[in-house]
């Protein structure tokens, strides 16, 4: 009969395992007020954080999917374990010894459980690490030495060696109290024709750990030509602990720097991870025995606190060969599923990061990451490179190939920018034609969705005739232009309802009005004393008109002063507040784009202090932008 864990132990472990620390191993949390932390929910996909942790209460709750509970409930859900196993896992974490009642032995009670499998893997890792010092392991040590990995590096990454004996590990662990069924369940042993045998033999091994540092499996490299298993690399099979689609080598070492720097570097192999970390790129990770996929992305997004308002950097580092280029193009297909900014860094001359470090030193790896190329640009240029641009037919073929790629880009501003660049890369003189084709492709795939604020008003504005004499159409803004709609509505609000527009409008800079005539109207309002001048109606309009000598600007002031705001009177205050918030958000978005552009041109390693200071500014700007977006998207704001 299974032993029972005392209520006293359960309470003590719950108290000792602080929920914010436990959750923090899986989710990047940010302060969200008194006794409140928030992050992206690990239990469902979301773009805006709705997962909250209350440290003083010891509970978590997601307002998106409804999951919630104490620290035990969190571990049960995220690790797919029973309550007892969650208690044991947290006990191991804090070093608490559990007293079982009514149990024969801990081995009998724990047989086959997650905690036993973890213990078996930990013991195996220690066994393999010790075996690396044996005479038999000389080729494994030589392999590491030839790649400039010393004994300290081997210890840091837990490198080990699987001896040649068919059951060396199995017998060692059985002497420690583990049974064959447990070792088989952990993927360490298997049943051979003549009895139990080890899974790995005569190979260099790396332990694969969770973000919490638990060993869940191993990766093994072939060293000897007479190895019966021809595959260069083999991994632990799928087990209760080891799921190749959701484990990453190096995540335990990289997670804190990924969370701190909001940047993850994805490489292709174990030695590449080692090389990157030893060179100072401590955010490097690699998938294990499978392609980098959706679950890996989700894990990194949570660590980077990546959402639709702040976007972390995901940098793919590939070998400089055709396989690496193909991998980069494959990554392009998944980029749109990720809110984070994706980049590509390709090592020169077909070298992987390990080879590059060996030949050119640590600085070469840091420079490789610093010179990253946006994934969009890399994918488009790679496609163009396959075409003969010296012929008209080749240029047409390049456009046909690349226009759909650019059309996938969701951000319309970024999409237009890449359309312009595409024209230049291909050598197409008519830039407007390329932009038009890309926009058409984007509409065919998925029409960009307008925000709730303004969609109805824009449709109505499109039905209104343009006022004013024909001679002024060349300089006056088009009232049907949706990109200028927030500017127009903000000016109408300030001219017709100055008291409602108030200080928020007065705080808007002239630079926020991108059309010259709208900027001129904004300047005239400011010169007239702003909305706080205490005037309204015709008197206020006359005062504003007196501040300009331009007949075009004066006529536009009159037009904006009488053009109807398509909203009910009782909704005017919220509507105007939303319009002003939208305009602020658009202006702030441009400032954020400039900061991001500067960050992309900087190296977080070589320019650490300046990079992180600017990064802090970006986070603050994104937070303010988010509050503006929330204010501008209320249901009551649409006309």
Swiss-Prot record:
Residues involved in Mg(2+) 1 binding: 268, 319
Alphabetical UniProt keywords: DNA replication, DNA-binding, DNA-directed RNA polymerase, Magnesium, Metal-binding, Nucleotidyltransferase, Primosome, Transcription, Transferase, Zinc, Zinc-finger
Listed InterPro entries: DNA_primase_core_N_sf (IPR037068), DNA_primase_DnaB-bd (IPR019475), DNA_primase_DnaG (IPR006295), DNA_primase_DnaG_DnaB-bd_dom (IPR013173), DNA_primase_Znf_CHC2 (IPR036977), DnaG_bac (IPR030846), DNAG_N (IPR013264), DnaG_primase (IPR050219)
Keyword DNA-binding found: yes
SMART domains in the record: DnaG_DnaB_bind, TOPRIM, ZnF_CHCC
GO terms for biological process, alphabetical: DNA replication, synthesis of primer
Database matches in Pfam families: DnaB_bind, DnaG_DnaB_bind, DNAG_N, Toprim_4, Zn_ribbon_DnaG
GO MF entries: DNA binding; DNA-directed RNA polymerase activity; zinc ion binding
Toprim domain: residues covered: 262-348
Zinc finger boundaries on the chain: CHC2-type: 41-65
Region span, Disordered: 460-479
Cofactor binding remark: Binds 1 zinc ion per monomer.
Gene3D superfamilies (UniProt xref): 3.40.1360.10, DNA primase, catalytic core, N-terminal domain (3.90.980.10), Zinc finger, CHC2-type domain (3.90.580.10)
Binding site for Mg(2+) 2: 319, 321
Alphabetized CDD domains for the sequence: TOPRIM_DnaG_primases
Cofactor: Zn(2+); Mg(2+)
Known catalytic reactions: ssDNA + n NTP = ssDNA/pppN(pN)n-1 hybrid + (n-1) diphosphate
Quaternary structure (record): Monomer. Interacts with DnaB. Co-immunoprecipitates with DarG in the presence and absence of darT.
Family: Belongs to the DnaG primase family.
Biological role: RNA polymerase that catalyzes the synthesis of short RNA molecules used as primers for DNA polymerase during DNA replication.
Domain commentary: Contains an N-terminal zinc-binding domain, a central core domain that contains the primase activity, and a C-terminal DnaB-binding domain.
Protein name (record): DNA primase
Organism of derivation: Mycobacterium tuberculosis (strain ATCC 25618 / H37Rv)
Lineage, broadest ranks: Bacteria, Bacillati, Actinomycetota, Actinomycetes, Mycobacteriales
């Amino acid at each position: 009969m299974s032993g029972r864990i005392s209520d006293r132990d359960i309470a003590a472990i719950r108290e000792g395992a602080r929920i914010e620390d436990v959750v923090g191993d899986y989710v990047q949390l940010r302060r969200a007020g008194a006794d409140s932390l928030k992050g992206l929910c690990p239990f469902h996909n979301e773009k805006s954080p709705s997962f909250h942790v209350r440290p003083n209460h010891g509970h978590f709750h997601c307002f998106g999917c409804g999951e919630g509970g104490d620290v035990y409930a969190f571990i049960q859900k995220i690790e797919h374990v029973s309550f007892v196993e969650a208690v044991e896992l947290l006990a191991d974490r804090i070093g608490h010894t559990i007293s079982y009642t009514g149990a024969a032995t801990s081995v009998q009670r724990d047989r086959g459980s997650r905690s036993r499998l973890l213990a078996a893997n930990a013991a195996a890792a220690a066994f393999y690490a010790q075996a690396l010092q044996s005479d038999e392991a000389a080729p494994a040590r030589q392999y590491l030495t030839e790649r400039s990995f010393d004994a300290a590096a081997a210890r840091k990454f837990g490198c080990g060696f699987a001896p040649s004996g068919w059951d060396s590990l199995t017998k060692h662990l059985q002497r420690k109290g583990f049974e064959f069924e447990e070792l088989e369940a952990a993927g360490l042993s298997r049943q051979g024709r003549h009895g139990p045998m080890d899974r790995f033999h005569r190979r260099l091994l790396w332990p694969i750990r969770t973000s919490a540092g638990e060993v869940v499996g191993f990766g093994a490299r072939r060293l000897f030509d007479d190895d019966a298993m021809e595959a260069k690399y083999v991994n632990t099979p799928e087990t209760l602990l080891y799921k190749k689609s959701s484990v990453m080598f190096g995540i335990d070492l990289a997670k804190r720097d990924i969370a701190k720097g909001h940047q993850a570097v994805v490489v292709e192999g174990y030695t590449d991870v080692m090389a990157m970390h030893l060179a100072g790129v401590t955010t490097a990770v690699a998938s294990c025995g499978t392609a980098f996929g959706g679950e890996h992305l989700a894990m990194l997004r949570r660590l980077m606190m990546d959402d639709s308002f702040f976007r972390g950097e995901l940098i793919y580092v590939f070998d400089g060969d055709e396989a690496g280029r193909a991998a980069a193009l494959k990554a392009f297909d998944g980029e749109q599923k990720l809110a984070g900014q994706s980049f590509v860094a390709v090592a020169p001359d077909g070298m992987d990061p390990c080879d590059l470090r060996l030949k050119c030193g640590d600085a070469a790896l840091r420079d490789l990451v610093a010179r990253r190329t946006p994934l969009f640009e890399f994918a488009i240029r790679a496609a163009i490179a396959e075409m003969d641009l010296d012929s008209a037919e080749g240029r047409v073929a390049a456009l046909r190939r690349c226009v759909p790629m650019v059309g996938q880009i969701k951000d319309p501003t970024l999409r237009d920018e890449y359309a312009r660049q595409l024209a230049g890369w291909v050598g197409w003189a008519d830039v407007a034609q390329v932009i038009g084709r890309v926009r058409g492709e984007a509409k065919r795939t998925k029409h960009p969705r307008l925000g709730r604020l303004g969609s109805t008003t824009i449709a109505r504005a499109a039905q209104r005739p343009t006022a004013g004499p024909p001679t002024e159409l060349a300089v006056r803004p088009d009232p049907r232009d949706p990109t200028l709609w927030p500017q127009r509505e903000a000016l109408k609000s300030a001219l017709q309802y100055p008291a409602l527009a108030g200080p928020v409008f007065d705080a808007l800079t002239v630079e926020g009005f991108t059309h010259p005539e709208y900027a001129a109207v904004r300047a005239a309002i400011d010169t007239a004393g702003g909305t706080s001048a205490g005037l309204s109606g015709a008197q206020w309009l006359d005062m504003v008109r007196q501040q300009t000598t331009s007949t075009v600007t004066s006529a536009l002031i009159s037009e904006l002063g009488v053009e109807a705001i398509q909203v009910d009177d009782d909704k005017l205050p919220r509507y105007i507040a939303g319009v002003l918030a939208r305009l602020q958000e658009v202006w702030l978005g441009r400032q954020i784009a400039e900061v991001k552009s500067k960050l992309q041109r900087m190296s977080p390693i070589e320019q650490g202090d300046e990079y992180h200071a600017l990064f802090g500014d970006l986070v603050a700007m994104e937070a303010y932008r988010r509050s503006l977006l929330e204010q501008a998207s209320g249901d009551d704001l649409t006309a």
